[in-house]
Amino acid sequence: MNLNATLIGQLIAFAIFVWFCMKYVWPPIIKAIEERQRSIANALASAEAAKKEQSDTKVLVEQEINQARIKAQEIVDLANKRRNEILEEVKIEAEALREKIIEQGHAEIESERKRVQEELRIKVASLAIAGAEKIVGRNIDEAANNDIIDKLVADL
């Protein structure tokens, strides 16, 4: 195989072309590729961080929802407890009022019974005196009648 001048010229031209590409063309291409790799790596890292943050946020939201449910249940339980307390207080007050009304009724009945009893004593005493007057046949003086009535009322 003969090396002639054309082949040597082509080798020199190719070497200059390779040197030119390595010096001026290759670095910007490599730089663009590396920058694109960094950009993709950053995007993947950001996506992974966002996914992790979304997962963490989801857990926090679920915890907050559970806490809100627990708090709501506590409020409902407290309201039910307070309602029951109020109902119990109302029952106690109603029972006390009922007892008071019954006592007042008994007192009124007792008072009325005593009044009627006193009226009855006076009428019985008056009838006894009237009967005694008829038996004796004469009228005893008024002061003596009142004394006798008072004594009879006290005895009855």
Swiss-Prot record:
The keyword Cell membrane applies. Keywords: ATP synthesis, Cell inner membrane, Cell membrane, CF(0), Hydrogen ion transport, Ion transport, Membrane, Transmembrane, Transmembrane helix, Transport. It is found in: Cell inner membrane. InterPro entries: ATP_synth_B-like_membr_sf (IPR028987), ATP_synth_b/b'su_bac/chlpt (IPR002146), ATP_synth_F0_bsu_bac (IPR005864), ATP_synthase_B_chain (IPR050059). GO terms for molecular function: proton-transporting ATP synthase activity, rotational mechanism; proton-transporting ATPase activity, rotational mechanism. Signal peptide: none annotated. It is a single-pass membrane protein. It holds the Pfam family ATP-synt_B. CDD domains: ATP-synt_Fo_b. The chain crosses the membrane at residues 7-27. GO terms for cellular component: plasma membrane; proton-transporting ATP synthase complex. The keyword Cell membrane applies. Belongs to the ATPase B chain family. F(1)F(0) ATP synthase produces ATP from ADP in the presence of a proton or sodium gradient. F-type ATPases consist of two structural domains, F(1) containing the extramembraneous catalytic core and F(0) containing the membrane proton channel, linked together by a central stalk and a peripheral stalk. During catalysis, ATP synthesis in the catalytic domain of F(1) is coupled via a rotary mechanism of the central stalk subunits to proton translocation. PANTHER family: ATP SYNTHASE SUBUNIT B, ATP SYNTHASE SUBUNIT B', CHLOROPLASTIC. F-type ATPases have 2 components, F(1) - the catalytic core - and F(0) - the membrane proton channel. F(1) has five subunits: alpha(3), beta(3), gamma(1), delta(1), epsilon(1). F(0) has three main subunits: a(1), b(2) and c(10-14). The alpha and beta chains form an alternating ring which encloses part of the gamma chain. F(1) is attached to F(0) by a central stalk formed by the gamma and epsilon chains, while a peripheral stalk is formed by the delta and b chains. This is ATP synthase subunit b. The gene is atpF.
